A protein has these predicted regions:
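Bacterial Sec-dependent N-terminal signal peptides
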Residues: 1-23
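Mature catalytic domains of secreted/periplasmic carbohydrate-active enzymes
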Residues: 21-455
Length: 455
């Protein structure tokens, strides 16, 4: 059995990783501006933060496979033929009795992310597999009722939120609208041949769907009423929607959410309308500036959660991604997957520290900035202070290349006689202006990474 499971795990890791690259959420094509003044104000505050973290942590961390998807009966998943689909699901559910993160240290998480320059945090309270990372009254399928049940920190969400609040983070909760463990979503009476979707006819069995709606409402009420101030409700599983005959009654959820948390930002991913207060392009950056609120969600590796042999993005890759996103008017939430023991991998800490060091010196061109009409010229990207008294340029150094002796851009001309200030060292440089072109000679000794300056 052990050999079979290992073989299955390897196969699923391969195919699911391929899926993770290809089948990603497309952002909505329509944006509806919120009218609630508290929501509008919260969105302004959130947009100023620019850089956040999204934690995926759950049962999938134990075998180190792509989050939840291996139990979904869709064509892109391949499994070892010696185990039936039901046997595999039973094995997967059984990881709950192995998930015992005795090294769980949310204070370490918060310190690492704060040092990385992140300003807000989103934590997976429940992914599509239905395993809750909080002590829910409505199911025993949670970390608080299995291998970790005797740990004083078994109500994981409580301690994650508290640790990040102490570091002055804006707090977000990820919640999956589909729950593949629930009998009211995947009913054992029927096979799961409808893939990720509810596996029975909602119109034929309305009482069961109503039970699922009530269950979902109650769990969202728990995470929004028992765990302190929450700023963002980040809802995943866009196929659970009215248009797909899976009406979860979002107006009812929204009324409860904003009663519990006035001004909360709601992110009903990919479902345009009043409950998608910002859009979430996944693993991608929009081609141009967008004139509404958005956030690219991109993992630090190729996977959202912990895997045993990750492919890491370099600090330079993340920094350059952040630069482009901010210049285009968005935020970046970076995916990090804690280990099954409850720690952040040293390789992640190393990269996050490097990102934080860059932001400590250059963050003035990132945080609390707004966009400029001329936001991009060659390798130079532009932002501005919110009062438009200061214009910033950032030369994006391509990975593997060395800083040039001088850089040139078009437009965004300095005022006559003004000098350009390098943010990393405070040195001022006199620019050369030729028509619409600006050239500056970079001082020696700069680190071989992207350079921010005030124009």
């Amino acid at each position: 059995m052990r050999k079979t499971i290992l073989a299955i795990t390897a196969a699923i890791m391969f195919s699911a990783n391929a899926m993770a690259q290809g089948d990603v959420y497309e952002r909505s094509k329509i944006y509806e501006w919120p009218t609630d003044k508290q929501v509008v104000e919260k969105l302004h505050q959130w947009q100023d933060l620019k850089f956040g973290v999204l934690f995926h942590w759950g049962l999938y961390a134990v075998p180190g496979i792509v989050e939840s998807w291996s139990i979904c009966d869709e064509d892109w998943i391949t499994r070892d033929t010696t185990m039936t689909y039901q046997q595999y699901k039973d094995w997967y559910w059984g990881q709950a009795d192995k998930f015992n993160p005795t090294e769980f240290n949310p204070e370490q998480w918060a310190s690492v992310m704060s040092d990385a320059g992140m300003k807000y945090m989103i934590f997976t309270t429940k992914h599509h597999d239905g395993f809750c990372m909080f002590d829910s009254k409505y199911t025993d399928f949670s970390i608080a009722h299995h291998a970790f049940k005797d740990n004083p920190r078994r109500d994981v969400l409580k301690y994650v939120n508290e640790a990040f609040r102490k570091k002055n983070f804006m707090i977000g909760t990820y919640f999956s609208k589909p729950d593949w463990h629930s009998q009211d979503y995947w009913w054992d009476v029927y096979p799961t041949k409808r893939g990720r979707n509810v596996n029975y006819d909602v119109k034929k069995w309305p009482w069961r769907w109503n039970a699922y709606k009530e269950f979902t409402y109650n769990q969202m009420n728990e995470i929004l009423s028992r765990y302190g101030k929450v700023d963002i409700l980040w809802m995943d599983g866009g196929w659970v929607c009215k248009e797909n005959n899976q009406d979860i009654d979002m107006p009812h959820i929204a009324e409860m959410a904003r009663r519990n948390q006035p001004g909360i930002i709601m992110v009903d991913r990919t479902i345009h309308g009043p409950y998608e207060n910002y859009q979430t392009p996944e693993r991608t950056i929009p081609e141009t500036q967008l004139n509404y609120r958005w956030e690219s969600c991109i993992p630090l590796t190729n996977d959202w959660g912990y895997v045993k042999h990750p492919t890491w993005k370099s600090p330079e890759k993340v920094i350059n991604t952040l630069i482009e996103i901010v210049a285009k008017g968005g935020n970046l939430v970076l995916g990090v997957g804690p280990t099954p023991q409850g720690t952040i991998q040293p390789e992640a800490v190393e990269r996050l520290n490097a990102i934080g060091k860059w932001l400590k010196k250059n963050g003035r061109a990132i945080y609390n900035t707004t966009t400029t009409k001329n936001y991009h010229s060659g390798n130079v990207w532009f932002t501005a202070s919110k009062d438009h008294k200061h214009l910033y340029g950032i030369y994006m150094l391509t990975e593997g290349e060395k800083l040039p002796e001088s850089i040139t851009w078009q437009g965004n001309l300095p005022k006559k006689g003004a000098k350009i200030k390098i943010l990393a060292n405070g040195k001022s440089i006199k620019p050369t202006i030729n028509g619409n072109n600006v050239t500056v000679k970079l001082p020696a000794g700069l680190p071989q990474q992207s350079v921010a300056f005030e124009i």
